[in-house]
Amino acid sequence: MRIDVLTLFPRMFEGPMGESIIGKAREKQLLELNVSNFRDFSDNKHQTVDDYPYGGGAGMLLKVQPIYDNLKAIEEETNQQPKRVILLDPAGKPFNQKMAEEFSQEEHLVFICGHYEGYDERIRTMVTDEVSLGDYVLTGGELGAMVMIDATVRLLPDVLGNNLSAQTDSHSTGLLEHPQYTRPAIFNDMEVPAVLTNGNHKLIAEWQLKESLRRTFLRRPDMLESVEMTPEMLKLLEEIKQEEQK
């Protein structure tokens, strides 16, 4: 996968995008990450990238020309127009796991990181997606882009040591992940549930499903509305409701 990031602060990406899973993906050549400063594409000697809004208003807006020329340079380099150009915007659609899965199917993504008060509206005509990290405002789009890149890249084949890890993560199944334990079996009188140490894989799978349902029911009941429930899951959910009422 190739990812291009358009930003005014490329150095912000040097550390986070060179470590851990993303760093390893780049080392394995599973990910090509290019970060460009769209100030370099400004057409005036002062390299201005923002200006006052027509009609008045608070703050400065990002100009259309530098971002347009930066996108055109990417198109010329790759000999094709990127299929997904993502604008980081507080007014955009909230980012979620399903969106990360969609992005992971693409060969090329472009992220545009905003700054200042906002964008010249004409920039929006150049993008395919307007995405927000959540219902709050950050100084710029850089941190949001890093989060989305991380969530997307870890879904690529062979990026994680165990591909099953991405499939069983919280949100990937529509449910929050069940509790997990490692050695020792007893620590400060806190014991690992016996079912996990008895070697009965059928009982373990049932416990994991039930506890995944329980955690989702208690912490994010809204997620259950979009889960396609099997008869077994419905039965377990009723048991959970009765247990939690005691």
UniProtKB/Swiss-Prot annotation:
Q: Name one Pfam family in it.
A: tRNA_m1G_MT
Catalysed conversion reaction: guanosine(37) in tRNA + S-adenosyl-L-methionine = N(1)-methylguanosine(37) in tRNA + S-adenosyl-L-homocysteine + H(+)
* Entry GO terms, CC: cytosol
* Catalytic activity, EC: 2.1.1.228
- Alphabetized InterPro entries for the sequence: Alpha/beta_knot_MTases, tRNA_m1G_MeTrfase_C_sf, tRNA_m1G_MeTrfase_TrmD, tRNA_m1G_MTases_N, tRNA_MeTrfase_TRMD/TRM10
Q: Where in the cell is it found?
A: Cytoplasm
UniProt keywords, alphabetically = Cytoplasm, Methyltransferase, S-adenosyl-L-methionine, Transferase, tRNA processing
Q: Which residues bind S-adenosyl-L-methionine?
A: G114, L133, G134, D135, Y136, V137, L138
Q: Name one GO biological process term.
A: tRNA N1-guanine methylation
Q: Name one GO molecular function term.
A: tRNA (guanine(37)-N1)-methyltransferase activity
Which SUPFAM superfamilies does the UniProt record give?
alpha/beta knot (SSF75217)
Establish whether keyword Methyltransferase is in the entry: yes
User: Cross-referenced HAMAP family, in alphabetical order?
Assistant: TrmD
The record describes the protein's role as: Specifically methylates guanosine-37 in various tRNAs.
Subunit record text: Homodimer.
Instruction: Give the family per the record.
Output: Belongs to the RNA methyltransferase TrmD family.
- Tell me what this protein is called: tRNA (guanine-N(1)-)-methyltransferase
